[in-house]
């Protein structure tokens, strides 16, 4: 059991010592954590331990030292011990010529949050073995590079022998994967892609590493070039195989491995799109796959490796890459090489002639750098390597000295949390084998882990222990009660209510006042010490507060009252018992003018000029009292002044005239003023306390001090002498100038009068500089008489070769800022140096007005800005004059004109009405400056202020050259003309700044505590200077000014500046008002490698106590006041949005002594590491500059002298909505001259949830001014962003506006003005397949919006809610053409006679019979004469609504085409029409079916006799019922954005779907028949994808569809081309940096076939949308689709909008393939194809068709889609293939693309030699 216990006094002493020595933060974590078990305790902090002593009554979770001090036995304390053991250590042998590291292995176990430091030794010899492997691109464009490499074999060997005596050299080559699209797979190209070349391959190891240089040269001579198609190469495959195939390549274990990668192209990488195009989906397995010939074999089955894979494998095998690339691909590899710890990048010349020099330079650079990285480290462990011997570079490697044993410090730290989860809850992140590896050798292997063991006492618990009254388990020294029991021994039933009466306070109905729990007749209060008393009636947070602190922080709250510390009294402990604060400067109490009460003086006679100890404030009396007494003294003593006469009687003091006045130090104040009446000066003094009263006396000197008598008679004489004096001065000046010119010609005189710079070189360090200029002294020697002016200039970046040439090539029209400095002809005052004073503002306005007036004569000059004033030290006799500094923006080419004009105006001493001093100006451009300085007579030294052009992009060491040009005025000669200035930019080891740019403090705090933080980038100490600067607060009146240095020791990251605040005097309130006092603290002069960060200046706002918000809530959440003054977590955090960009966050102060609070806030969903920090001195803060309608998370902690306390609970809050921005660009689909379809994009910044749009349109005149009222349309569905506007006035311009509304209101409008009639016309082309995006080729390169068709817009307003088609039709249908005013492009209308309108239901079997009598349905399936068509048994949705006998087919209305088939067979089973049941077709009937084209993949197409995209539905009534319920709709938008000449972003909008989406599929292929590629997107929230490695100037077709659990939805299709300039020698390789545009294909428009007779047809097509030149004609070829005959060619001349060709001599029932190409002066463009068949059949009994009918079908035969046409001589119209038909008007679809890509357009079919009228449709975008 327990041993002897220490005495209570010993415990007390030990606890006091520990409380002083230990950090409060650690104690807080162990004691404050809400733990319930031993295991939870030891995981809180690395220093936490647990006491299992049964008799222990204190808190069991604490530090081990405090548990011992509290009486817990050492053997009862559970603590987890860390371990560190070196398992392998071999000392470094410097005699060996190989890289070594010591130790080689260790085992370490750490507790969460614990760190372990150890040293690591690494040795790199002066010379080590080198393995050099050259990996070269063997594509055709590298042929000259290969030839040069063959010639340079001897030079390569020579360089290697200079680098090391032990080397091997090898060679490998690569091209790309031998598959489509990377390689041309035609047999002849696979054999020889280029003349005299090898077959294509992926990678081949040609020469393994060998010491025989001759063998290397001989084998290299036999190599030939190869080739591929696309520009990027497959070099990543080659690099990976080179790394992992160590035996095949021949890497030696102890040598330096160098891999030279030479190419001129970009690279393929994992999942970049080319692999998908090639059908390769599996990842690279990172294994060696070389055959016996050294050829890579798995290029067809495995993807390219990723960049992280290559980085990891090259580091694992100690391979250092050297990228030797040409300028064309330099930008790609410039970023790539930064991912490798140690690598090199060099620019390879076009023919690789400099590869040897590049290799030598790279090797020298690499061998001086060493990188040490931790590989395979678990997420719970962090490793950091530092060194005191070697400097760290930007990339993290060390700049080493080879031949020395380097010592490195390794820090291994076990994290407590990983991504917000405790590391002990993540078993996979707790341990691992870390490989600490340097660049050139094997490294240290660490078996590291985190201790997350369970306490052994928890595994040995006593279940239902007798110690716990059999009502609980005894675990780790205490009882864990079962449910329903409580108490230390679980002997109290929580369910018993019989004993709560003793816990009820008189007059209350809640036991324990609602603040505790009644257990066995006794109250157990909540809050762990917050509530006290028999009934928990006292709240220890409700005692009085002073300045926000409980009991003034000078006592504790007990039983509802403050128990004050010794020396303090009062209800809130705010009165000191001593009178130390009342002692005056003489040692008395309140200067004898009052008494001391509660530590403050209460003066008997209060005055404006008495301070807090009743002492007269003479500094406040002097400036105000003299002025107050002046008028009364003047009128009483001399009878003069403004109060002379009766008003003099108002003076309330007496005047006594005396002969002599006392000295100033003997009286309160001594004053002197000038009497305006006689110009004499009178003096007086004031005695006493300085407060004039009725009994006060002012002593006045009897005698005034008057000036001597006047001499008015001299004035006329002087007026006469002035002209003579002027003439004399003029003659003297001429004589002196002549003498000086003569003296300048004499050698003896000339030699002694020189000007020049004092020094010829300055060396500056940028981190020690306090300004961006340098005052460079210039001396004048010899005779100092007269005036000399020196003209000078400074040039930046003299160290860069060719810098002047580069500067000359810069755009001359580019606007650059010019700095201008002038010396004004006026003295400088203190107010001019303060930018917020009125005098400064007036002068600034005067300067800017006059200078703008002068410089406006130079073209392109903007107005002045940033005007400020200063003084120039060391400026001779004019250093008290005002210098103005300003900036004006002007073109770069305007510099000579600016310089000439400035010199001219300075010589004239005026800029318009602004007077300036001569001989001084400075004009600063972006890279140079010119100026002028003046030596006045007798002046020996002046300073030249030289700008230093400090910029972040400067070189580490840059040079400036200052040059004295000439002496335009004066006789001096130039001595030292040149000054070199060198500026060294050291890499910052750390950055020092303030925590925030502004702090708010209370005057009652007495001290402003300002945190200064240091972001440590490297070890060592840092130092900065600081000083305060007055603002509206004044030093020694509001605060005590301070200045000094802050020294950060190594590892220190936070310091605090303290500025003492002074109490506000009453006189300050009267004289200075209630303005906010603020002063500034600035950091400067960083030392020891420190840099100043932002902000390096902060503003301190002093708020008076009555200004602060002191509202504290009376009820607070329970929290234990921690012992020893530790801080708790702030309570009751509350956040409330104060606007769209503000959140008000407040909380209740914690217990303890908080000095301030730190608020951390971030956007919800972001990582907490991206949080913003804010400091506050009061328990509330306003978060500003937030995003509207955005969710934020925040929490707060308090900090004090011992550090930060715990954070509060997390609070989230959403900002209010803000009005949205204007909608996206408006797009117009011009249907006719009076009908347009208007669409718009969603606002770029919705700032909330869009609820509606408002569209307004109205007439405007020629000046775009409105005519009459605007019409408004409210679109209350925010997803419908389209509107069809009809009945507009023809040939009239309209103004259209669209604005959006959210919860905050209406946003700004987007406006467009367009006249439909004035737009260019072209033949109408309405796709049968809707929702195809149309790209406006004339809109430039901005493709944010697209014109498109939408079934949301093209609905019939009087029809159903969705476009629908049904074959539930009644009999006796009659077609009525929609011509004239009834023309509606949105509908195809079939009308029944009113007497025959049926009423059909979903189960109706009624069918259609073409003008046949209506009969009952035939379910028997037998044929009959004149019978009706039986309905298919295939289940379908309800039938179409019939209104007024009209059935509306949406046109184009849906994504499916309409197909009406006619047949003359007597009775046939159309088994191909339905995959489920036979579909019977009678000889005299017609059926309406639906053809699912290539944009809709039907799930019902199972028959192999049909094309895969063909399906027939017998009854479909609505848009939503075309597919199974829950199947996604078509994505509602398809948008293309070009990212480069070979990359494209494809975006779409989420489709409607009743079920959750599971992802998307994106397919794309070349329009002319390339291989199909598919991208699967499993994330339904991702609605865009980037497609790389497209071929430039090639057309691609894209299809997007969505998937739910019910299956795939319909597709959205679009065609796009990226046009760019290509390399002359490689047509598929775009020129780097060339412009690229997004466009549609330049093929002719869709082909339209019109059958004229059984053996002839008419072919028509449109002019290409992008002709790319002048069209001179077309080439049309016709051939049999199945072969069997030669092709026939036709030439069609002209450039009309639509061209036609009649083709005779065709055969019936034979499919023909037609191709049309446009011909320009540059050649033929891409071709448009179509297949047509003229079928001739006998006519059936169709009265409206006659004997022949035209039948259009769309089976996909072979790889083309085709159209079958049956000629008819009928004059009546009919519906064919879902197209619009009228009298003598039939439109057919034309096949445009191969495979599954079809583009259907409506066209005219002439049946009787008469052509119907065309309708126009244009597309424009504003």
Swiss-Prot record:
UniProt binding sites for Mg(2+): 139, 141, 233
Domain Fibronectin type-III: start-end pairs: 1129-1218, 1222-1321, 1530-1625, 1643-1739
Chief localisation class: membrane
Expressing tissues: Integrin alpha-6/beta-4 is predominantly expressed by epithelia. Isoform beta-4D is also expressed in colon and placenta. Isoform beta-4E is also expressed in epidermis, lung, duodenum, heart, spleen and stomach.
Composition bias type Gly residues, residue spans: 1418-1427
Protein keywords: Calcium, Cell adhesion, Cell junction, Cell membrane, Disease variant, Disulfide bond, EGF-like domain, Epidermolysis bullosa, Glycoprotein, Integrin, Lipoprotein, Magnesium, Membrane, Metal-binding, Palmitate, Phosphoprotein, Receptor, Repeat, Signal, Transmembrane, Transmembrane helix
Domain Calx-beta residue range list: 979-1084
Biological function: Integrin alpha-6/beta-4 is a receptor for laminin. Plays a critical structural role in the hemidesmosome of epithelial cells. Is required for the regulation of keratinocyte polarity and motility. ITGA6:ITGB4 binds to NRG1 (via EGF domain) and this binding is essential for NRG1-ERBB signaling. ITGA6:ITGB4 binds to IGF1 and this binding is essential for IGF1 signaling. ITGA6:ITGB4 binds to IGF2 and this binding is essential for IGF2 signaling.
Disease linked to the protein: Epidermolysis bullosa, junctional 5A, intermediate: A form of epidermolysis bullosa, a genodermatosis characterized by recurrent blistering, fragility of the skin and mucosal epithelia, and erosions caused by minor mechanical trauma. JEB5A is an autosomal recessive, intermediate form in which blistering lesions occur between the epidermis and the dermis at the lamina lucida level of the basement membrane zone. Epidermolysis bullosa, junctional 5B, with pyloric atresia: A form of epidermolysis bullosa, a genodermatosis characterized by recurrent blistering, fragility of the skin and mucosal epithelia, and erosions caused by minor mechanical trauma. Junctional epidermolysis bullosa is characterized by blistering that occurs at the level of the lamina lucida in the skin basement membrane. JEB5B is an autosomal recessive, severe, frequently lethal form with variable involvement of skin, nails, mucosa, and with variable effects on the digestive system.
Free-text domain note: The VWFA domain (or beta I domain) contains three cation-binding sites: the ligand-associated metal ion-binding site (LIMBS or SyMBS), the metal ion-dependent adhesion site (MIDAS), and the adjacent MIDAS site (ADMIDAS). This domain is also part of the ligand-binding site. The fibronectin type-III-like domains bind BPAG1 and plectin and probably also recruit BP230.
Subunit structure: Heterodimer of an alpha and a beta subunit. Beta-4 associates with alpha-6. Interacts (via cytoplasmic region) with COL17A1 (via cytoplasmic region). Interacts (via cytoplasmic region) with DST isoform 3 (via N-terminus). Isoform beta-4a interacts (via cytoplasmic domain) with DST (via N-terminus). Interacts with RAC1. ITGA6:ITGB4 is found in a ternary complex with NRG1 and ERBB3. ITGA6:ITGB4 is found in a ternary complex with IGF1 and IGF1R. ITGA6:ITGB4 interacts with IGF2. Interacts with TMEM268; this interaction prevents ITGB4 degradation.
Designated name of the protein: Integrin beta-4
